[in-house]
Amino acid sequence: MSGHSYASVVDRIYSRKSSELYDNIAYLHHPSGVTVVVLRNIPESEVVEVDFGTTKKHGADRSTNQVSGKGKKGALILQPDSKLCTFKCKDGSEHVVRAGVRGTLVEMNDRLKTTPDFIRTAPDNQGFIAIITYGAGVRETEGMGDDLPPKRLFLKS
């Protein structure tokens, strides 16, 4: 049986980049300058909780932040070491996800509150962590590493 290999739908639209600072995240970078933060190293144990709170700013929940308008008024400014979320696995392990780039936090995936295992089972679509932009006219930022190989789909004929 011979099969054909095709790039996934996500990899046809976005370029997959590594983080220079953190090996547990990857970026799906769109040519428009929008970047989706996804998990790169998928834990084997089921994810049971995702916490978007932070110890700074009195534990504010990042997922409830409201962003509006063309200028993204109300968006949080991220530094490379800004914590996006912490997720806990069934085996008791806890993982911190940081931004890794300087940018503007447009959206957190609040779907992970009700279905936290999406971060493990569907990291490139329903389980994305955050959406980041970089300001007017900026398409890419420092902190993104090398291109990662695209995910391939194999169809049997």
From Swiss-Prot:
Coiled-coil segments on the chain, per record: none
UniProt cross-references to InterPro entries, sorted A to Z? Abitram (IPR039169), Single_hybrid_motif (IPR011053)
Gene Ontology annotations of biological process type: dendrite morphogenesis; regulation of actin filament polymerization; regulation of filopodium assembly
Q: Which GO terms describe its cellular component?
A: dendrite; filopodium tip; lamellipodium; nucleus
Report which superkingdom the organism of origin falls in.
Eukaryota
What is a GO molecular function of this protein?
actin monomer binding
PANTHER family, from UniProt? PROTEIN ABITRAM (PTHR13651:SF0)
Q: What is this protein called?
A: Uncharacterized protein F54F2.7
Q: Which organism does this record belong to?
A: Caenorhabditis elegans
